[in-house]
A protein has these predicted regions:
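Active-site neighborhoods and metal-handling regions in enzymes and metal-associated proteins
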Residues: 1-132
Length: 132
């Protein structure tokens, strides 16, 4: 069953999505060699909370983090850890959710870490093109 939303509800949904987009932009900026996925999680959570939102994933079904972070061949929804350090040549997939005024924004992106192989760059490019 589809529930039609009011203009006000749609605006709130957009606001939640905007926060997620801002977090993903930060993740792209900070996803550099030497940073841990736990540090990325802390950056994401700080921005979500500063924006007046709540990290949607944190505590959901016992999930211990604000983002899901998966490096290279790891399946999405990886748990950020302080011992998972990004290396040049990695690709990282990050999933972010933010609940704002009762509405959830949720999106995932994959980013290169430093210089990556042509094959990995093509994978990211083709995947992005299929969505946009």
């Amino acid at each position: 069953m589809i529930i039609c939303k009011t203009r006000e509800q749609i605006a709130k949904m957009r606001d939640a999505g905007k926060i997620v987009a801002e977090v993903l932009a930060l993740m792209e900026e900070y996803a550099k060699p030497g940073i841990s996925t736990a540090e990325l999680d802390q950056i994401a959570e700080a921005h979500i909370r500063k924006s007046g939102a709540v990290p949607t994933f944190l505590g959901y079904g016992g999930f211990p983090a604000s983002i899901c972070a998966s490096i290279n061949e790891e399946v999405i929804h990886g748990i950020p850890r302080s011992d998972k350090i990004l290396q040049a040549g990695d690709i990282i997939s990050i999933d972010v959710g933010a609940t704002f005024r009762g509405y959830v924004g949720d999106a995932a992106r994959t980013f290169p870490v430093g210089e990556i192989s042509e094959e990995d760059a093509r994978l990211i490019r083709v995947t992005e093109e299929s969505f946009f």
